[in-house]
Amino acid sequence: SALFLPMVLLGLHHGLIPIYAVQLEQMGGVSLFPVLSMGGAGQVGAAIAIYLVARKVGNKKMQGIITGALPAGFLGVGEPLIYGVTLPMGKPFITAGIGAGFGGAYIMFTQVMANAWGPSGLVAIPLMQGATGMLNFLIGLIIAYIGGFIVTKLWIKDSDVREEEENFETTNVEEKY
């Protein structure tokens, strides 16, 4: 799960679907999907940490981006947080992956299996096998949220989130040509 986000960037996560299908057929459930779902949860935790720092330093633009992208993140759509927040900042993209790793490790330890695959995040809870699987998946999400939050909070500084002053050239177009 810690390495899932770079796969998303490259679109390689779609290549895992045949593996899910083979697991479902041969094992009666999918073990890889619940683990990889933690990638988005790490993003959510990292984004919440960044939001708190952005509020502290007065970066309204970042607060707005996170506020708009966070609901989708909780529902398992991580791309708005990846492309709008963590990847442009750099370090939080890594810290989100580390947080995801904690949740993924818990999912593997508790052997959560899914009956199918689909969106990740909170909406994936009903896809897990049995009440225990659903509960452990939820606990894994919470661990990844908290892991992403803590690692990001420890790693970023106020200066990483402070809004940069915009410097636009005011050169007349006619002067250039």
PLM segments and residue spans:
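Alpha-helical transmembrane segments of multi-pass membrane proteins
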Residues: 1-2, 64
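Transmembrane alpha-helical segments and their short flanking loops
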Residues: 19-23, 50, 57, 68, ...
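Membrane-helix interface "capping/anchor" motifs
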Residues: 3-15, 56-60, 88-94
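Transmembrane alpha-helix interface/packing and boundary motifs in multi-pass membrane proteins
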Residues: 2-13, 27-30, 72-75, 107
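Hydrophobic alpha-helical transmembrane segments of multi-pass membrane proteins
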Residues: 3-7, 38, 71, 138-142
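Membrane-embedded helical hairpins/re-entrant loop segments and their flanking transmembrane helices
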Residues: 18-74, 78, 85-89
